[in-house]
Every structure is written in structure tokens, then in C-alpha cells.
Amino acid sequence: MRVAIVAESFLPNVNGVTNSVLRVIDHLRRTGHEVLVIAPDTPRGQPPADRIHDGVRVHRVPSRMFPKITSLPLGVPRPRMIGVLRGFDPDVVHLASPALLGYGGLHAARHLGVPSVAVFQTDVAGFAESYGMGVASRAAWAWTRHLHSRADRTLAPSTSAMENLAAHRIPRVHRWGRGVDITGFVPSARDEHLRRTWSPDGRPIVGFVGRLAPEKHVERLAVLAARDDLQLVIVGDGVDRVKLQTVLPTAVFTGELRGAALAAAYASMDVFVHPGEHETFCQTVQEAMASGVPVIAPDAGGPRDLVAPCRTGLLLDVDGFECALPAAVTHLIAERRRYGIAARRSVLARTWPVVCDELIGHYEAVLGRRSLRAA
């Protein structure tokens, strides 16, 4: 099968969209499929992004920054995208978290008569609210409906996302979750030297991993930074870092980590907290659980499918999140081992090969649907 992936975000930007696309590329190549990636270039004034990734051609389009919409550059589609796709001759077009560039990819796919699978991964309407643009939420949903209703199939990563899409009259929605690297994220990566570096006096470590952007609501962890009986660690980087370093003056900020360093950071935490409620899936929750770390998250969005309350972690009411957080952390620190073992066990069947095989099944389904239409 020849698969063209139109990715709204890709390397050198590292986030949930990029990471899932990288996993899909790897699995497709390992299973004998051919792949083309269409993705944003770096903004003007920055070094150009790679045109080849692991042997796969990456066609780059110009990008622009839209600070009132997202902290990431957005790809601007060009008419020649049709020619790029025609030259590759794909069997299916995979739209990864489509927005501006994804819409261009969808238009090109429809023009060429190629079936498309749109992966809903970013809650743009929720993000708009986080950026102080509540009025834009309805417009964001109108755009999402306009785009996804034209795809042959929309894939949502969680029950909450499926319900949200259905409530906004988006058709042909199916479930496709995310895998986790259970050999990379492991409890045995716990590093006592790293823990002493973060917390020299041995206080329990509570951590967050993710992009430091308004929609993540990392500032809600201020109620923990004020405590003298634990150490807060923030892993990641982004536009809010300077502000958060002021709001969380006692926290350790590591910057962005990858690979073994990221695995060690997860496993070296005693409790993982994700404070934002606009996650369609929340991959960092799953990675923390694979690392044997109990999780606290809002009772909203993707974490509802991932966290089993009072077994693998705790889900807190969104409106009372900050009030309930200190007691929840204290409870999980006391019961860390029991919760951590259960958290690890809960993700062992969610490997990337299994999940990516499910994705190929969705590709085959839209190909079959198109064949039936033609007949």
C-alpha cells in the first residue's frame, strides 16, 4: 500500500502529533508499505527542516506562526500539493490532526479521487478557549465539521473525542487509540542519582511532562510548588516556560527530554500529574503508566479512557482540580507501589504494532468502501 501522510506537525517540532506520525511511519515501512510525508517547513529565518526522514521523503510546505491560534507553526497549503500527490500515486491519504495543511491535503485527495482518513487529535476549540478566545470556539467547531465531513473516515482517539465529534454532527467517526512503547518506558528506568539531583533531601517527586503552552494549564501545579514536603519537576519546553518559572519558583525545569533521558525522568517520578482538560488522548499519561507511575488527571477528555480511578490513578473534577490536587498527591505518594504496578499492567496490551495494525485496517476499510462505490 502507498500511504501519503499529511502531517499538521512534524519534526523538528516534537509533540503528540509528531510522535504518533513517527510511529506510523516506522510501522508502515516495517510491514512493507511505501510512505510519503507532507509537512510544514520551519518558519522563515530558521534553518530548513529535513527533507528525508529515515529513508522517507518529506515534502515541505511554507509555514507561518499564528500566535493567537497555536504556539506551533502551521503549514500553508500550496496548489502544487496536487502534483506532489499525483506523482506519488497514493492508495490512501492519512491526514494527521488536519487544520490548514490538512485541508489542503484533503482537497488534493478529493481532486485525485483518493480515499482519506482524518485523524482527530487536537482539540482546537478547547485550545481557543485556553488562549482567551472563547468566541472562536464555535468557529473552530464549524471548521472541524467542514473538514472532517469531507473525509472518508475520521478516527478519534478516545470515547470522549468520539462523543464530542458526534455532538457536533461529524459523520463516519471510528475509534483509533494510541500505542505506547512498553520496552522504552519501563519502571526499571528509575534513576536514584537523578532523583537525588532533583530532590537532594529525598522529598517525593511529582512531575509533569509536556509542551509548556497555555492549553496544558501547568500553572495549576502552583498549589504543589508551594509545598515543602515534595519536589515538583517540569519536563518540557514551550512558549510559557518563562512565565511558569515565575509561577512555579521551586520547581525543577529540565527542558525537553527524549529517548532514555525521558524514560528515566518518567520512571524517577513518584506521581505524574497532567492538569489540562483539553486532551483528546493524552499520550504522556500512558507513558507515565508504562513507567509504573500513578497518574492524576482531570476527569475529562482522553484520560477518562486511560486512568482507572482508585486503581491506576485518580481523576479530579475539572472545576475543583486545584483544590483536590494536594490531597490526591498525598494519597498516591502513600500508595505509590500498588498504583504503579496496576498502572504498568493496564497498558501492556497497548503496543504500537497492535495499534498501527488497527490503523492499516482503517485504511483498508476506506479503500474497500471506495471500491464498492465504484462498482
Swiss-Prot record:
Name it: GDP-mannose-dependent alpha-mannosyltransferase
Q: What does this protein do?
A: Catalyzes the addition of a mannose residue from GDP-D-mannose to GlcAGroAc2 to generate 1,2-di-O-C16/C18:1-(alpha-D-mannopyranosyl)-(1-4)-(alpha-D-glucopyranosyluronic acid)-(1-3)-glycerol(ManGlcAGroAc2).
List the pathway annotation: Phospholipid metabolism; phosphatidylinositol metabolism
| Record-level Gene Ontology MF annotations | mannosyltransferase activity
GO CC, any one term: membrane
Q: InterPro entries of this UniProt entry?
A: Glyco_trans_1, Glyco_trans_4-like_N, Glycosyltransferase_grp1
What are the alphabetically sorted keywords of the record? Glycosyltransferase, Lipid biosynthesis, Lipid metabolism, Phospholipid biosynthesis, Phospholipid metabolism, Transferase, Virulence
Show the Gene3D superfamilies listed in the entry: Glycogen Phosphorylase B
Q: What is its EC number?
A: 2.4.1.-
GO biological process annotations for this chain's record?
glycolipid biosynthetic process; phosphatidylinositol metabolic process; phospholipid biosynthetic process
**Family to which the UniProt record says this protein belongs:** Belongs to the glycosyltransferase group 1 family. Glycosyltransferase 4 subfamily.
